[in-house]
Amino acid sequence: MKILGLNGSPRKNGNSMKLLESAINGAKDAGAETEIIHLYSMNFKGCRSCFACKRKSPMYGKGCAMKDDFTGVMESLLAADAWIFSTPIYNGHMSSSMSALLERFYFSHNSYDAHEKMVDREYPSLLIYNMNGNQNFLDKMGIENSCKYDVFLMESGFGKSQYFIANSTIQFDDYSKYHTAAVPIDAKMKLSSEQFPQDLQHVYNLGKNLLS
């Protein structure tokens, strides 16, 4: 069994990647084969609204017709048995790269003929989000509703899905190098040092049980 991880952050060693690696390690320890793709290393854009995936043609049911680096990612997704997506939250939403991926992947596999899946098997998925805002900010802005909608789309098109949000993450190794006067740095560093290891353990467990 293979689990594909997708890093939706421009950084390859940031919070998104650390969370993804922890979940992937859980999957490995459960016996899964794993692979990680860095989306920001790919060259692709979001949906162009060409509707080629909905036309009555031999292309119907074969995914997005636009050919770019997304094509290979789509093939890797469909060749795997489960997926782990990890993305930072920018301005209340997943990163633009992750959004571009999922809007094309979901829409090209969304049937207008019937409310049924266009794939021939179930693909369990885990969506991991992280943000530097704290839990109070997350609740106040209703960010979790967006994550729940992402899960709804994944379950509508592909199979059982779940999500996790890590909050109060650290953005910089050294805050003194940046204009961050409004940030309560000491309190933030203390909270992150206590909470982030727990978040890593939590997503490890989710990754380990993803195929169970």
For each feature predicted by the language model, list its residue ranges:
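N-terminal beta1-alpha1-beta2 submodule of the flavodoxin-like/Rossmannoid cofactor-binding fold
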Residues: 1-114, 182-212
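Short, solvent-exposed beta-strand-terminating loops
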Residues: 44, 161-177
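Short aromatic-enriched loop/helix-cap "lid" or pocket-rim segments at secondary-structure transitions
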Residues: 47-50, 138-140, 173-178
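Short, catalytically relevant binding-site loops at active-site mouths
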Residues: 90-92, 133-134, 170
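Short, glycine-/small-residue-rich phosphate/pyrophosphate-handling segment
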Residues: 96-97, 109-165
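The feature marks non-catalytic terminal segments
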Residues: 157, 176-185
